[in-house]
Amino acid sequence: MGSFILALDQGTTSSRAILFDRGGHVAAMAQQTFPQHYPQPGWVEHDPLEIWESQRSVAAQALEELGPDARIAGIGITNQRETTILWDKATGEPVYNAIVWQCRRTAGICDKLKETPGMAETIAEKTGLVIDAYFSGTKLKWLLDNVPGARERAERGELLFGTVETWLIWRLTGGAAHVTDYSNASRTMLFNIHTLAWDEELCRLLAIPMCLLPRPVSNSEIYGTVVPGIEGLEALAGIPVCGAAGDQQSALFGQGCHERGQAKNTYGTGCFTLMNVGGRAVRSRAGLVTSVAWSLGGKTIYALEGSVFNAGSAIQWLRDELGLIGTSHECDLLAESVPDAGGVYLVPAFTGLGAPYWDMYARGCIVGVTRGTTRAHIARAVLEAIAFEVTDLMNAMRQDAGCEITVLRVDGGASVSDVMLRFQSDLLRIPVDRPQMVETTAFGAAALAGLAVGFWQSTDEVRALRVSDRVFSPERAQAECDEKYRLWKRAVSCACGWIEKA
């Protein structure tokens, strides 16, 4: 057996490849950004071929870094979820750009679905989701309805649909495996999370030909092997692709949240809080959604999830659009230079509000600005906004789960911010635990792949590899934090419903 597991981590703004050894340590890593396309306000697209090429390139770089003696036992994939790709079965050519999870172009389709009596209840009951442009189903419908000839070609069986892990597995296996794992399938709004199968009624309602859909599979099994002849990946020929999970479920697994009641938050482009709710799907009454966390060894685990669309992207906005900071780290330095945000509240609803508000028509706002407001106050307001968003999610989760969450495990790029995590602990009134090895999303995919081929023998062995770096505990007075949170809710009310429905 090989000495390493290769994890392919395909994210919203970059593709990464990480090689893990048996101790869960990073042995080699490569990362590459790829272009974002914004054809209209509120629309977000990726070129699927750029996704593939960037992922292929970083895998080749990571293998080269490790050297010619690297022996790979298996490949795990984790990915940005909901992003929707439609391609030609024969040529592998995409028929259109990938419609990214952040894209709001299908808000009108969602509005019509909501107007149908009983539709919201049916979708919630079967899929665990709310009707929102976030999920893949309406994105796929848009492609079929708007790309010339796509619907006819789909009905003739000439096209294939997939989320990003499906696309990557299909490319790696030379088209031999057209599959999706249960965690990604559960984010499409087409998948019944109770039967673990595509739902014929929902596909019919959205006019989705079922011949397009990939075969649903568990999160830890051999899907196929890498074909020879992929440039830079010749050494992977014959290596099994054997683990896959959506990025947030993968992070939950990688954080060792394997027991009911354990929760994590990923501070990435968006913010994603997930709680393991065990082997029974819990229906949310507080604006959250229910998804498959993973299916392993014949046992399916579910998660409550709250997703916000813009978190780390707000820091990128300060840097790239406003030019207030030169690097992401500078946001932290500026925020630490002031004791608070000076009464400024920023709601980063650039592409609407996710859980628990689900307002497709919200847009970003900054309130409380005075002549004394500095860029340091704005920087701190951004970091505090991210913590407020997570607090919204955690409050909803506590309400739905009916049990107390005693610690929040955290990861993601923005989790390096001590300022933000201190404030997060203050707001939640519980410890916030950051691990030493922050690549928990990639490690989750590696662990699922490793378990499939016996690289690791048990989830207990995987869980023991997690080590804390720092645990943040509440410091500010609760009354002060409660008042700040009250004002945050006022600021959110200013952002809601800003765009008028067409």
Task: Label each PLM-derived region with a short phrase.
Residues G24, D47, I75, C103, ...:
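Residue-level signal for inorganic ion chemistry
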Residues M1-Y96, G108, E125, E231-G243, ...:
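N-terminal glycine/serine-rich phosphate-binding loop of ATP-dependent small-molecule kinases
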Residues C211:
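A conserved beta-strand/loop element that lines the FAD pocket in flavoprotein oxidoreductases
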Residues E64-W101, V130-S136, I169-N192, V217, ...:
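Short beta-strand-loop/turn "lid" adjacent to the catalytic site in phosphate-handling enzymes
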Residues Q32-T33, W101, L288:
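A generic structural motif
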Residues I5-L8, D69, A107, K114-H178, ...:
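Active-site core segments that coordinate phosphate-bearing ligands/cofactors
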